[in-house]
Amino acid sequence: MTGIVCLDQEDGLLFNGRRQSRDRVVTEKILSMTEGKPLWMSAYSRRIFPEDAPVCVAEDLVGKLAEPARKDAEQVESAQEELEREKATQKEPWQQPGEAAFCLIEEAVDLENEIIDEWIVFRWKRVYPADVFLKFPADDWEKELIETFAGYSHEEIDLERYRKKNRAKF
């Protein structure tokens, strides 16, 4: 799964429980890059997207992402039974191994999460007040600058990709 976040120049994510900034061009780019694939977010994040945007809202998104990605051997049978019962219902991406999905994160999250193996970062070219940070340790993550573009309310925004270094290449 690919996580999407917006950070400032000092890796700030939130201040006093709120996003630092937003930009409508970023919202458009997120919808463009995820077109045709599930885009999960919290109800808080949903408010910045158009009403007709094809997004999926999950309450306690970060909590669900923190659940173990793999079941113990003793839990496999129980998990298979549960999956059979839910077969006809829409499942969340972390219950669908191998399905390409995206999630927009606007709250504190653990980078050691096994479910998210790639991050897309929209980086504001400013420093905002922040009390929640998301730092990518250089030893664990490879950084790639994809592009710098003009936003609606920001002169420049960097689009970066971070991938786990130990990620298997196929």
Label each region the model flagged:
Residues 1-170:
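Enzymes that bind and transform nitrogen-containing heteroaromatic metabolites
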